[in-house]
Amino acid sequence: MPFTGATRVLGIIGQPVSHSLSPLMQNAALQAMGLDYAYVPFAVEEDCLADAVRGLAALGVVGFNVTIPHKSAILPLLDRLSPEAELIGAANVVKREGSDLVGYNTDGTGFIQSLSEDLGFTPAGCRILVMGAGGAARAAVASLAGAGAASVVIANRSIARGEELSAAFRRHFIGTQFAAIPLDPENLNRCVQNFDLLVNTSSVGMGGTAFPGMDLSRMGPHGAVYDMVYVPAVTPLLAEAERCGIRYANGIGMLAAQGECALELWTGVRPPEGLMKACLMAALMS
């Protein structure tokens, strides 16, 4: 579809964004839906964020994704936040609504959708271990508690940060128990059988880097493992799950699902089911 003066603009801001697969899947969906939009990546340095947001608003951009390192820093630059973005403390989607820029967070929704579609896993009543305490962990913990998890334990190198995250969500989700433990392989190996789901939200394992010392053999076949890292497709953590006969999934489904939610927010139309995920998988296999 040729671009004209009537073409509406969507995009993604971050630094770096050259590696982002969002333009690929979003433009493929827009073309399949016959919508006159273009989705463009914008590299934005941290000290230029405010100028970039003002510029995008002035140019009439319909909406944009927000990625590292701007998901939290952008909040004070927006006019309003969705309840999810406010609770998580981060926005990965911005939509222009009248003269306002409104921040949303579709990461949690995408994560829960991927758990269901890729693992057949429902968090309600389950005991869950989340590794990491950064922005991705905040979205995961909030969505798991919101879906009725019985308990969420946060394992992080800085236990103080894990405890801070636990305390923040404990006030909002009284039906879920929260705790924090050190992200220490020996400690995790001893207690892994106590969990129904293990979620890695950290960057450990990205690019095939080793996940030191993990032994999931005590978890048993009832458990499940989710790694938000998706390059490589089978990370060291997922390879360990496979060795132990535990069902597992990587983060490609979450990336696709949050993108579907974002596109529906911007256009009011749900993209064809499975299209974004198929685009991503084809790109990663090529």
Swiss-Prot record:
Reactions this protein catalyses: shikimate + NADP(+) = 3-dehydroshikimate + NADPH + H(+)
Gene Ontology CC terms, in alphabetical order: cytosol
Pathway where this protein functions: Metabolic intermediate biosynthesis; chorismate biosynthesis; chorismate from D-erythrose 4-phosphate and phosphoenolpyruvate: step 4/7
Protein EC: 1.1.1.25
Alphabetical keyword list: Amino-acid biosynthesis, Aromatic amino acid biosynthesis, NADP, Oxidoreductase
Binding-site residues, shikimate: 20-22, 67, 92, 107, 230
GO BP annotation list: amino acid biosynthetic process; aromatic amino acid family biosynthetic process; chorismate biosynthetic process; shikimate metabolic process
Binding site for NADP(+): 132-136, 228, 251
Annotated active site: 71
Enzyme superclass (EC): oxidoreductase
GO molecular function, one term: shikimate 3-dehydrogenase (NADP+) activity
A Pfam family of this chain: Shikimate_DH
Top-rank lineage group of the source organism: Bacteria
Gene3D superfamilies per UniProt: Leucine Dehydrogenase, chain A, domain 1, NAD(P)-binding Rossmann-like Domain
Matching InterPro entries: Aminoacid_DH-like_N_sf (IPR046346), NAD(P)-bd_dom_sf (IPR036291), SDH_C (IPR041121), Shikimate_DH (IPR011342), Shikimate_DH-bd_N (IPR013708), Shikimate_DH_fam (IPR022893), Shikm_DH/Glu-tRNA_Rdtase (IPR006151)
Family to which this protein belongs: Belongs to the shikimate dehydrogenase family.
HAMAP family: Shikimate_DH_AroE
UniProt subunit comment: Homodimer.
Protein purpose: Involved in the biosynthesis of the chorismate, which leads to the biosynthesis of aromatic amino acids. Catalyzes the reversible NADPH linked reduction of 3-dehydroshikimate (DHSA) to yield shikimate (SA).
Protein's UniProt name: Shikimate dehydrogenase (NADP(+))
Protein species of origin: Geobacter sulfurreducens (strain ATCC 51573 / DSM 12127 / PCA)
